[in-house]
């Protein structure tokens, strides 16, 4: 059987992979646009008439805004968020303490998972941004 020079295992390759993987895992950088989207998202939540359920208790929209801002700051410090979607997935959809999902309830409507509410609002933010860009052009 012929030896394939491209498939040969080199111990130095393993060492390189071990050293570089942690750096790649922590390389999430938030773009200016993503940060603006998250800020708008949290502002929409904070100024809404919705309630936010976490760890067994309903909280006001203002308290939800403050809580999620603290989680965002922590995640940014740890380089764990690179987009609005990642923030929703990692920081705004469930408790990092209990693992229980966050819920949102607006205007006496049935509660829904916060991830659904936030993604829907993010879609609206993006539609509005695209419409503003189109009007400028």
Across the structure, where does each feature detected by a protein language model lie?
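A generic "functional-site adjacency" signal
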Residues: 1-4, 39
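Bacterial N-terminal signal peptides that target proteins for export
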Residues: 3-14
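N-terminal signal peptide c-region/cleavage motif recognized by signal peptidases
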Residues: 20-25
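N-terminal secretory signal peptides
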Residues: 28-71
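Compact alpha-helical subdomains of small soluble proteins
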Residues: 56-137
């Amino acid at each position: 059987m012929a030896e394939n020079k491209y498939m040969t295992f080199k111990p130095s390759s393993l060492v390189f992979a071990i050293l570089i993987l942690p750096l790649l895992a922590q390389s999430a950088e938030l773009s200016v646009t993503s940060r603006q989207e998250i800020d708008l998202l949290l502002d929409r939540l904070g100024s809404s008439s919705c309630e936010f359920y976490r760890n067994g208790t309903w909280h006001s929209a203002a308290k939800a805004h403050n809580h999620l801002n603290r989680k965002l700051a922590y995640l940014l410090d740890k380089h764990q968020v690179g987009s609005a979607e990642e923030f929703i997935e990692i920081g705004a959809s469930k408790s990092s303490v209990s693992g229980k999902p966050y819920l949102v309830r607006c205007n006496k409507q049935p509660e829904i998972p916060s991830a659904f509410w936030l993604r829907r609002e993010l879609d609206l933010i993006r539609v509005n941004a695209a419409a503003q860009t189109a009007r400028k052009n």
